[in-house]
Every structure is written in structure tokens, then in C-alpha cells.
């Protein structure tokens, strides 16, 4: 038979409400185990994550379970052992995952347990694969480079045709079809 407290402690209720509010503001969550990290290492990790507007919060598993349940999410498998959650917007989740895995290479005590990215549950291996993908800015720049390269090649071909014509060489443009 479970023993129940006679009354709820206001400090604990406030802590759960604060955590619920923070979880509600974020769209993605990356769960980590921080056992063995020093205060200096946690501070350095938080500083690196701040670049991505990420809040890295050490949570009590019971409080986090209550908060996630109130948000209609079940994450019990990630709330085992000392848990810290990186709260981040989906736009920056890739960069945060990359920072966490890079930090885990330097400090093996940090373990990424899994994530919920925009409502989809990822295990640790999927989060690691996700962290290796290029971010949104990199993808946009790669796309624009490809567009620019095609345009530059087209302009160079046109310029070569103009140069040949100026030299007096007759230029004929042949289509890819049959010329017979």
C-alpha cells in the first residue's frame, strides 16, 4: 500500500509548475544522463548550448514525469537515473544534438539517452545520426551554392558564344535532338 502525503508542499508544486511551463515552451527535448560531470563541466556545457537558445535543466525524474504527463507525453524510459533535459526549439535541435555529442566525446560521463524532436521519439542512436546531419543554415547555403553554380555555368557558356562570335567564328547551337 502506497503512503500518501497529507498535503502537497508548495515548493514542490511550484517546481513542477515551473518545469511544466518550461517544457510547454520548448518543442524538442533531448534527455541526457549527467552522472559524473563536475560543476565546471556542466557550466561549460550550458554555455555552449546557450548559443542555440537552449535551456539545459537538471530535473527530478518524478517532477519531470508529472510535467510530461500533464502535457500528454510519456517519457518514462528516459527518466531513469540522474537526468538533465535540453529544452530547445526544433529549429536549433540539430545544433544542440551536435554540441551534446561533441561534448560527450570530450567528457564520456555525459550520456545522451534519447530525444523527442517535434513530437517524434528518437533513441540515442537516432539522435546521434540526426546530430551528424547539416543544420538548416548549412542546407540553405548548399542549395544556394548549387543554384549559383548552375547560373554561373550558363553565363559562362553564353559569354563563350559571344566571344566566338566576336572573333568571327560562326557558332551554331545544336539541340540534343536528331539532326538528320
Swiss-Prot record:
GO terms for molecular function: large ribosomal subunit rRNA binding; structural constituent of ribosome. It comes from the Bacteria. Pfam families: Ribosomal_L10. NCBIfam families: PRK00099.1-1. Keywords: Ribonucleoprotein, Ribosomal protein, RNA-binding, rRNA-binding. This is Large ribosomal subunit protein uL10. PANTHER family: 39S RIBOSOMAL PROTEIN L10, MITOCHONDRIAL. Part of the ribosomal stalk of the 50S ribosomal subunit. The N-terminus interacts with L11 and the large rRNA to form the base of the stalk. The C-terminus forms an elongated spine to which L12 dimers bind in a sequential fashion forming a multimeric L10(L12)X complex. GO terms for cellular component: large ribosomal subunit. InterPro entries: Ribosomal_uL10, Ribosomal_uL10-like_sf, Ribosomal_uL10_bac, Ribosomal_uL10_bac_type, Ribosomal_uL10_CS_bac. HAMAP family: Ribosomal_uL10. GO terms for biological process: translation. Belongs to the universal ribosomal protein uL10 family. Forms part of the ribosomal stalk, playing a central role in the interaction of the ribosome with GTP-bound translation factors.
Amino acid at each position: 500500500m502506497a503512503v500518501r502525503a497529507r498535503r502537497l508542499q508548495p515548493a514542490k508544486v511550484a517546481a513542477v509548475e515551473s518545469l511544466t511551463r518550461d517544457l510547454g515552451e520548448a518543442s524538442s527535448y533531448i534527455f541526457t544522463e549527467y552522472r559524473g560531470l563536475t560543476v565546471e563541466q556542466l557550466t561549460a556545457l550550458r554555455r555552449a548550448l546557450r548559443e542555440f537558445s537552449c535551456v539545459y535543466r537538471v530535473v527530478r525524474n518524478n517532477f519531470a514525469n508529472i510535467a510530461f504527463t500533464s502535457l500528454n507525453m510519456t517519457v518514462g524510459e528516459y527518466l531513469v537515473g540522474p537526468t538533465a533535459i535540453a529544452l530547445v526549439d526544433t529549429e536549433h535541435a540539430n545544433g544542440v544534438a551536435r554540441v551534446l555529442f561533441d561534448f560527450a566525446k570530450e567528457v564520456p560521463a555525459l550520456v545522451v539517452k534519447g530525444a523527442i524532436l517535434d513530437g517524434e521519439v528518437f533513441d540515442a542512436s537516432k539522435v546521434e545520426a540526426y546530430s551528424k546531419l547539416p543544420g538548416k543554415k548549412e542546407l540553405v547555403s548548399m542549395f544556394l551554392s548549387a543554384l549559383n553554380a548552375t547560373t554561373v555555368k550558363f553565363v559562362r557558356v553564353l559569354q563563350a558564344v559571344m566571344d566566338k562570335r566576336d572573333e568571327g567564328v560562326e557558332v551554331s547551337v545544336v539541340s540534343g535532338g536528331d539532326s538528320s
